[in-house]
From Swiss-Prot:
Entry's Gene Ontology molecular function annotations: NADH dehydrogenase (ubiquinone) activity; quinone binding
UniProt-recorded name of the protein: NAD(P)H-quinone oxidoreductase subunit 5, chloroplastic
Top-tier EC class: translocase
Localization in the cell: Plastid, Chloroplast thylakoid membrane
EC number: 7.1.1.-
Subunit structure: NDH is composed of at least 16 different subunits, 5 of which are encoded in the nucleus.
GO cellular component, one term: chloroplast thylakoid membrane
Native source species: Tecoma stans (Yellow bells)
Principal subcellular localisation of the protein: plastid
Function, in words: NDH shuttles electrons from NAD(P)H:plastoquinone, via FMN and iron-sulfur (Fe-S) centers, to quinones in the photosynthetic chain and possibly in a chloroplast respiratory chain. The immediate electron acceptor for the enzyme in this species is believed to be plastoquinone. Couples the redox reaction to proton translocation, and thus conserves the redox energy in a proton gradient.
Keyword Translocase attached: yes
Family: Belongs to the complex I subunit 5 family.
GO biological processes: ATP synthesis coupled electron transport; electron transport coupled proton transport
Keywords: Chloroplast, Membrane, NAD, NADP, Plastid, Plastoquinone, Quinone, Thylakoid, Translocase, Transmembrane, Transmembrane helix, Transport
C-alpha cells in the first residue's frame, strides 16, 4: 500500500505526453501526424485508463484502511522562507480522480466519432489530455499555491475548448465571456490565499488548518478580516462552479463541442469549485458567517438555475442551467455542513449529466442531417420531436438520465438529492421548502426537454399531422401544447428556405433534390443533402456504435452508482460504502456519521420527495405531450384556453415568467449596462482625457516652442543692432517685472 501512495505523484503526468507529442509532431512531421491522428485518440484513452486503474486501487485501499497520505518536498530559499510542494491523497482526491478518469474515458471514446470529420481533431485531443492533466494536478495538490496554479490551467483549458471553433463569433464571444467572468473569481481567490498566508504564514493545508484553529481558540485573529479572506476564497468557487452572481458564462459555454460540455459539466471545471469548497471546509467551519454565505448563495443558485431552465429552447442551454441548479444543491449542502451529501451528489450528478450531454450530442448529430449544421437549428428543441422511433438507444439512455436527475428511485441522483433535502430541513425549514420546490421544478424542466425532443412528430417544418387539408396549425409553444395561437405559415423563426440546406462549417448552401422532395411530400420529414457525402436524408438516424457505447456504460453508472451511498447500516450489514470511504475527512471535520437509518423515516421522506418529482413530471407531460398523439379531441384543449379575465391574467403572468426565464432573468443585460457600459464609458473618458489633455499639453509645448523659435529666427537677421535691441527689450521686461514684485513686497509684508 505504501508503494502505491509513493508513486501517486505520477497521476497528473500520465496524460501529459499526448499534447506534447501532438505539438511536436505537428511542428516537425505535420503530414504524418495528421495521417495517424486516430493513434492519438487511442493513446489518450490508454493513458487515462492507466490512471483510472491507479485511482481505483487508491480508492479501494482508502475504503479498507481509511488512510490519508501526504508527501511534501521542501525547497529552502533562506532561513526565513522555504517553498514546499507535494501531493495529497485522501478520500476527496480519490473520488475526484475516479470521476475524472471514468467520465473522461467515456468522453474520449465518444469524441473519436463525434469529431471524426473536424479539422481540429488533433487539437481537440491535445486540449482534452492537457485538461485532464490540469484537473489531476488540482485534486492532488497539497497547498494553496499548487491549487492556484492548476486552477488557472484548468480555466485556460476550458477557455480553449469553449472557443474551440474560434472562427465562429458566438464561440469566440463565449470564450471571452468565460475568461472575463472567471477573472473576477480568480482574483478573489488569489487575494484570499495571500490573506490566509499573511495570517498563518503557511500555504500547506494541514499547517494552515492547525495554525488557524490555534489562533481562533486563542482569539488572536481579526474576525472581519478573516471572514473577508474566506469570502474571497469562496469567490473563486462561485465563478468556477457558475454560482450566482458569476454564473453568466456557463450557458454561453455551450458553443464548444458537445463532448466538452459533458466533461466540463460532469467532472472538471464546474466540479473544481465544489472541490475547492470541500477541501477548505475544515477552514470555513470555524469562521463566523461564512457558512451562512455559502448556503445562501447555493440556495439562490438552486432556484435561479431551475427557473431559467424553464423556457430555454436550446437543448444544451437547458442542460447547462440544470447543471447550475444541481451545483447549487452541492454548495447548499456544503454550506449547511453536509459534507457527505455534497460529495455524494457530486458523484451521482456527474454520471447522470455526462449521460444527458452525450445523449444530447447524439440527438444533435442526428438532427444535423435534417436541418443543417447550424447550432441554432440542430440544437433547437422546437424543431425536434418524434425522435423515439429513429434513435431508440439514445432516447432510452436520455430518459434514464432525465429520471435520475428528476430524483426518481432507484436511479443515482435520487439517493443523493434526497439526502440533501433531508439535511436542509434540519438546518432551516425555509431553505428546505425552497429546495423541495426546486426539486419539483427540476423534474418539470427535465421532462420538458425530454418531451420536446423525443415525443410526438418531427416539428422542423410544422407538418400538418391531422390528415385533413384545412385543419388549424397549432404552435409548438415553449410553455406546452395547450397554446391555441395560430402560427403563420410564413413563420421565419429558425426555418430554412424550402430548397436550401446550410452547413455549419461553410457559408455555402446546397440545393435539395426537388424530385425527391415531391416524392416524400407526405412524410413528416424534410430532405437535405448531407454536408460530407451529398447524400439526401429524409429522417434522423441513430449514432454509430462508438458514440452509443459510452452512453450504455454511463447508463450502468446511473443505475448503480447510487448504491455506494445507501445509508442503511443495519445489524450484520454495512451497505454505506461512501461513509467508509469518507471516514478520514468526516473525522477531520469532527462530524458524526449516522450509525443507522430508520426505514420509516427514510421512506417517509423519500415518498414526499418522489411525490413532488412525479407532480413535476405530470405537469410537464400535461403541457408538452403532443396534442395530435394523445389528445385527439381538440375540444378538450379548448376547455383550457377559454377566454376571460382570469385567463387573460393567467396568460399575462405566464408571458412575464416566460420572458424572465428566456431572457436569463435580465441579468446579462444588467451586467452589460452597468459593468460593460460603465467600463466602456470610462475607457472613452480616459481616451478623451489622454488625447485632449495629456497629448494637448505635450503637443502644445512643442507648438509653442516651434513658433517661439520661428519668431526668434525672423527677429535675428544677422544685424548686431537687432540683437542689441532684442537683448535690451528682454532685460527691460525682466527689470519691470522685478520692480513690480519689489514694490508689491513693500506694501504687503508676508
Amino acid at each position: 500500500m505504501e508503494q502505491t501512495y509513493q508513486y501517486a505523484w505520477i497521476i497528473p503526468f500520465l496524460p501529459l505526453p499526448v499534447p506534447m507529442l501532438i505539438g511536436v509532431g505537428l511542428l516537425l512531421f505535420p503530414t504524418a501526424t495528421k495521417n495517424l491522428r486516430r493513434m492519438w485518440a487511442f493513446t489518450s484513452i490508454l493513458l487515462l485508463s492507466i490512471v483510472m486503474i491507479f485511482a481505483t486501487n487508491l480508492s479501494i485501499q482508502q475504503i479498507n484502511t481509511s488512510s490519508i497520505y501526504q508527501y511534501v518536498w521542501s525547497w529552502t530559499l533562506d532561513n526565513d522562507f522555504s517553498l514546499e510542494f507535494g501531493y495529497l491523497i485522501d478520500p476527496l482526491t480519490s473520488i475526484m480522480s475516479m470521476l475524472i478518469t471514468t467520465v473522461g474515458i467515456m468522453v474520449l471514446i465518444y469524441s473519436d466519432n463525434y469529431m471524426a470529420h473536424d479539422q481540429g481533431y488533433l487539437r481537440f485531443f491535445a486540449y482534452m489530455s492537457f485538461f485532464s492533466t490540469s484537473m489531476f494536478g488540482l485534486v492532488t495538490s497539497s497547498n494553496l499555491i499548487q491549487i492556484y496554479i492548476f486552477w488557472e490551467l484548468v480555466g485556460m483549458c476550458s477557455y480553449l475548448l469553449i472557443g474551440f471553433w474560434f472562427t465562429r463569433p458566438p464561440a469566440a464571444n463565449a470564450c471571452q465571456k468565460a475568461f472575463v467572468t472567471n477573472r473576477v473569481g480568480d482574483f478573489g481567490l488569489l487575494l484570499g490565499i495571500l490573506g490566509f498566508y499573511w495570517i498563518t504564514g503557511s500555504f500547506e493545508f494541514r499547517d494552515l488548518f492547525q495554525i488557524f484553529n490555534n489562533l481562533i481558540s486563542n482569539n488572536e485573529v481579526n474576525s472581519p478580516f478573516v471572514t473577508l479572506c474566506a469570502a474571497l476564497l469562496f469567490a473563486g468557487a462561485v465563478a468556477k462552479s457558475a454560482q450566482f452572481p458569476l454564473h453568466i458564462w456557463l450557458p454561453d459555454a455551450m458553443e464548444g463541442p458537445t463532448p466538452i460540455s459533458a466533461l466540463i459539466h460532469a467532472a472538471t471545471m464546474v466540479a473544481a469549485g465544489i472541490f475547492l469548497v470541500a477541501r477548505l471546509l475544515t477552514l470555513f467551519i470555524v469562521i463566523p458567517y461564512i457558512l451562512n454565505i455559502i448556503s445562501l448563495i447555493g440556495l439562490i443558485t438552486v432556484l435561479l438555475g431551475a427557473t431559467l431552465a424553464l423556457a430555454q429552447k436550446d437543448i444544451k442551454r437547458g442542460l447547462a442551467y440544470s447543471t447550475m441548479s444541481q451545483l447549487g444543491y452541492m454548495i447548499l449542502a456544503l454550506g449547511i455542513g453536509s459534507y457527505r451529501s455534497a460529495l455524494f451528489h457530486l458523484i451521482t450528478h456527474a454520471y447522470s449529466k455526462a449521460l444527458l450531454f452525450l445523449g444530447s450530442g447524439s440527438v444533435i448529430h442526428s438532427m444535423e442531417t435534417i436541418v443543417g449544421y447550424s447550432p441554432d437549428k440542430s440544437q433547437n428543441m422546437v424543431l425536434m420531436g418524434g425522435l423515439t422511433k429513429h434513435v431508440p438507444i439514445t432516447k432510452t439512455s436520455f430518459l434514464l438520465g432525465t429520471l435520475s436527475l428528476s430524483g426518481i428511485p432507484p436511479l443515482a441522483c435520487f439517493w443523493s438529492k434526497d439526502e440533501i433535502l433531508n439535511d436542509s430541513w434540519l438546518y432551516s425549514p425555509i431553505f428546505a421548502i425552497i429546495a423541495w420546490a426546486t426539486a419539483g421544478l427540476t423534474a418539470f424542466y427535465m421532462f420538458r426537454i425530454y418531451l420536446l425532443t423525443f415525443e410526438g412528430h418531427l416539428n422542423c417544418h410544422f407538418q400538418n399531422y391531422s390528415g385533413s387539408q384545412n385543419t388549424s396549425l397549432y404552435s409548438i409553444s415553449l410553455w406546452g401544447s395547450t397554446c391555441s395561437q395560430r402560427i403563420n405559415k410564413n413563420f421565419h423563426l429558425l426555418r430554412m428556405n424550402n430548397n436550401e440546406s446550410s452547413s455549419f462549417f461553410s457559408k455555402k448552401t446546397y440545393r435539395s433534390d426537388q424530385t425527391l422532395r415531391k416524392t416524400n411530400r407526405g412524410r413528416p420529414f424534410i430532405n437535405i443533402v448531407h454536408f460530407d457525402t451529398k447524400k439526401p436524408f429524409s429522417y434522423p438516424y441513430e449514432s454509430d456504435n462508438t458514440m452509443l457505447f459510452p452512453l450504455l456504460v454511463l447508463v450502468l453508472f446511473t443505475l448503480f452508482v447510487g448504491s455506494i451511498g445507501i445509508p442503511f447500516n443495519q445489524e450484520g450489514t454495512d451497505l454505506d460504502i461512501l461513509s467508509k470511504w469518507l471516514a478520514p475527512s468526516i473525522n477531520l471535520l469532527h462530524q458524526k456519521s449516522k450509525d443507522s437509518t430508520d426505514w420509516y423515516e427514510f421512506l417517509k421522506d423519500a415518498i414526499f420527495s418522489v411525490s413532488i418529482a412525479y407532480f413535476g413530471i405530470f405537469l410537464a407531460s400535461f403541457l408538452y405531450k403532443p396534442i395530435y398523439s394523445s389528445l385527439k379531441n381538440f375540444d378538450f384543449i379548448n376547455f383550457f384556453v377559454k377566454t376571460g379575465p382570469k385567463r387573460y391574467r393567467w396568460d399575462k403572468i405566464l408571458t412575464v415568467l416566460y420572458d424572465w426565464s428566456y431572457n436569463r432573468a435580465y441579468i446579462d443585460p444588467f451586467y452589460t449596462t452597468c459593468f460593460t457600459g460603465a467600463i466602456r464609458g470610462l475607457a472613452q473618458l480616459t481616451y478623451f482625457f489622454d488625447r485632449r489633455v495629456i497629448d494637448g499639453i505635450t503637443n502644445g509645448v512643442g507648438i509653442m516652442s516651434f513658433f517661439l523659435g520661428e519668431g526668434i529666427k525672423y527677429a535675428s537677421g544677422g544685424r548686431i543692432s537687432s540683437y542689441l535691441f532684442f537683448y535690451f527689450c528682454c532685460v527691460s521686461i525682466f527689470l519691470v517685472i522685478y520692480y513690480k514684485f519689489y514694490l508689491f513686497s513693500l506694501y504687503i509684508p508676508f
